[in-house]
């Protein structure tokens, strides 16, 4: 089996799998609805990418792997089935992709990309497959001739149960993506327990409401007791967080916020199974962050523009706390958040929590909901966010942002939140 075709290859997670299999020696092709930065990069790397989907794209393929967004009526999926070509969902393909690796898997509702990327910096001999772009490598995949592989495991479709972890980290088990679990929290928690039980080494945030009751042997982080003297500073506009962990001394990591110290601590405790503490302390300094996580796009004395993937109230609240600290340290007098809600179901289920998450900032701008394929839900957002400015669009013009109504945002700390298209709106074309 040599020719593998990915339907939906432009996705951040599926593109990492395609890159990994290409490095393993398979001939990779793919397709997507529209061209993107990821599809352009894949083409430069030698992957044949077809835009848009067309039934002829799967001719002469041995295997088709499709993303979670692909429906049965997709022309490529339908034609592959008609021709008898084996078709696997991303979830079903994981055992094939990870089969010969010792997998260090990171799961959790929040913080898994950051934790897995920090772990990748510490275990620098390991291959890496994550759902974010590692800034020090410029990719969501690193291939090494190694048995070890750092993998960001996804609970949203229970695919983390197919990752066969040697080491499992769970950052938290907050209820997200409940639709996949029949809207039953107990089923989600059972899946997390099954994921942990599979691993030989387990590292957990033991102050999480569910994880604190996990009975099997594990390395437990109690953040309120184990993380001390957490301080933040800015060096040439770059954010850094320092903290002490248990009796292991002080650590310094790129990025800002207590939540970053928590994620780094989980990665450190996992890495201690394989490395000495001084090696960990040194390698942690190599970490340069990931794209779309407190990602500083522009900074001077009057303006800092930040892009963040946060799309759940818990994430937004934690990141805004870090943003307030950055603004204080940098002398920025005003904080503006630009929010592109992601999925109607998530917004409807967490309206009060979203309103509370944004209540501490000076100015809130709300873009239309990024539906991600969902049917619209009628919501009175103006009643929930009475002080917000609602705009149809926003775009980057030089250093500044300009809204569709003509408002210009040009000073203070400006931070965009969302998992949809907002990142493209905040960036220059070449970023």
UniProtKB/Swiss-Prot annotation:
<keyword id="KW-0573">Peptidoglycan synthesis</keyword>
<dbReference type="GO" id="GO:0071555">
    <property type="term" value="P:cell wall organization"/>
</dbReference>
<comment type="function">
    <text>Cell wall formation.</text>
</comment>
<dbReference type="InterPro" id="IPR013221">
    <property type="entry name" value="Mur_ligase_cen"/>
</dbReference>
<comment type="similarity">
    <text>Belongs to the MurCDEF family.</text>
</comment>
<keyword id="KW-0132">Cell division</keyword>
<dbReference type="GO" id="GO:0008360">
    <property type="term" value="P:regulation of cell shape"/>
</dbReference>
<keyword id="KW-0547">Nucleotide-binding</keyword>
<dbReference type="Pfam" id="PF01225">
    <property type="entry name" value="Mur_ligase"/>
</dbReference>
<dbReference type="InterPro" id="IPR004101">
    <property type="entry name" value="Mur_ligase_C"/>
</dbReference>
<dbReference type="Pfam" id="PF02875">
    <property type="entry name" value="Mur_ligase_C"/>
</dbReference>
<keyword id="KW-0131">Cell cycle</keyword>
<dbReference type="GO" id="GO:0005737">
    <property type="term" value="C:cytoplasm"/>
</dbReference>
<protein>
    <recommendedName>
        <fullName>UDP-N-acetylmuramate--L-alanine ligase</fullName>
        <ecNumber>6.3.2.8</ecNumber>
    </recommendedName>
</protein>
<keyword id="KW-0961">Cell wall biogenesis/degradation</keyword>
<keyword id="KW-0067">ATP-binding</keyword>
<dbReference type="GO" id="GO:0005524">
    <property type="term" value="F:ATP binding"/>
</dbReference>
<feature type="binding site">
    <location>
        <begin position="108"/>
        <end position="114"/>
    </location>
    <ligand>
        <name>ATP</name>
    </ligand>
</feature>
<dbReference type="GO" id="GO:0051301">
    <property type="term" value="P:cell division"/>
</dbReference>
<dbReference type="InterPro" id="IPR050061">
    <property type="entry name" value="MurCDEF_pg_biosynth"/>
</dbReference>
<dbReference type="GO" id="GO:0009252">
    <property type="term" value="P:peptidoglycan biosynthetic process"/>
</dbReference>
<dbReference type="InterPro" id="IPR036565">
    <property type="entry name" value="Mur-like_cat_sf"/>
</dbReference>
<keyword id="KW-0133">Cell shape</keyword>
<dbReference type="InterPro" id="IPR036615">
    <property type="entry name" value="Mur_ligase_C_dom_sf"/>
</dbReference>
<dbReference type="InterPro" id="IPR000713">
    <property type="entry name" value="Mur_ligase_N"/>
</dbReference>
<dbReference type="InterPro" id="IPR005758">
    <property type="entry name" value="UDP-N-AcMur_Ala_ligase_MurC"/>
</dbReference>
<dbReference type="Pfam" id="PF08245">
    <property type="entry name" value="Mur_ligase_M"/>
</dbReference>
<keyword id="KW-0963">Cytoplasm</keyword>
<dbReference type="GO" id="GO:0008763">
    <property type="term" value="F:UDP-N-acetylmuramate-L-alanine ligase activity"/>
</dbReference>
<keyword id="KW-0436">Ligase</keyword>
<comment type="pathway">
    <text>Cell wall biogenesis; peptidoglycan biosynthesis.</text>
</comment>
